[in-house]
Structures are given as C-alpha cells and as structure tokens.
Amino acid sequence: MAVLTGLFGFFAYVRGAVSQRCFSTSGSLSAIQKMTRVRVVDNSALGNTPYHRPPRCIHVYNKSGVGKVGDQILLAIRGQKKKALIVGHRMPGSRMTPKFDSNNVVLIEDNGNPVGTRIKIPIPTSLRRREGEYSKVLAIAQNFV
C-alpha cells in the first residue's frame, strides 16, 4: 500500500510539473522578418503564377531585421530572388497605419520600379510621405487606406 501511495504521489508531482510549463503553440504576430510567408499583390507574372510554395522573405534591408510598411525585403519566389516593397502587414502598427489580414508586398526591380502594372489591394497612405522613393509604386496604386 505504501508503494502504491508513493507512486501516486510521484505521478501527481510529475503532472504538476508538466502543467506549470507555459508555451504557446500559436504563431507570433510580428511584422515581416526572415522566413515570413508573404502575398504578392501586384499583377506581375512572377507573383501570380500558382506554385506549390508561397513566397518567403529571406532578408530585410534595415538595421533591426524586422520589416514594416515601406521597407524593402528580398524574397525567394519560384526559385528566384527578387526585391519587394512591403505595403501591408498583419502586426498592428503605429497610429494611422492600418492592420491587414495578410503580409502584402509589391515586387520591384533593383532600381525601385515596380514589376507589375497594377496593385490589386488598397495601400496605406503613409507611403505617400516617401513619394520620392516610391513614386512609381504610388502611381500604379488604385486605392489608398
């Protein structure tokens, strides 16, 4: 009987130790960083052809390594490396920056010109402050939020 009580005490101890550990199984709601899946929202041929793997960010061109709206990133898309501009992300941003349902990017060339000719979703008006850098991207946008 004493052995049985000792075993139950041990199992209660193990169960209590395991249940006290806290770990999350949900994904973090951060902005765009390395290996983040993104959605291409322009009408470029490279971004709209179906492929079995979604495009992923492989580098963020800023000091912190976390991309926000208006930052440039390097994508791995269909076995190629392409630059892209972030036009929306899921993480809640600063004031007057909308939160989107997905991480949206527009493919750009090395000189900053957009690859596509139309952007399918509304883009944030906060990009208008940087109009010198991204004036051609703003020109092909149809809606602003």
Curated annotation (Swiss-Prot):
Keyword check for Mitochondrion: yes
Where is the protein situated, by its record's location annotation? Mitochondrion
Name used for this protein in its record: Large ribosomal subunit protein uL14m
The entry sums up its family as follows: Belongs to the universal ribosomal protein uL14 family.
Query: Gene3D superfamilies, per this entry?
Result: Ribosomal protein L14
Please tell me the species this chain comes from.
Rattus norvegicus
Membrane-crossing residues?
A: none
Q: Which residues form a coiled coil?
A: none
Q: What is its main location?
A: mitochondrion
Sorted UniProt keywords: Mitochondrion, Ribonucleoprotein, Ribosomal protein, Transit peptide
The GO cellular component terms are:
mitochondrial large ribosomal subunit; mitochondrion
GO BP:
translation
Oligomer status and interactors: Component of the mitochondrial ribosome large subunit (39S) which comprises a 16S rRNA and about 50 distinct proteins. Interacts with MALSU1.
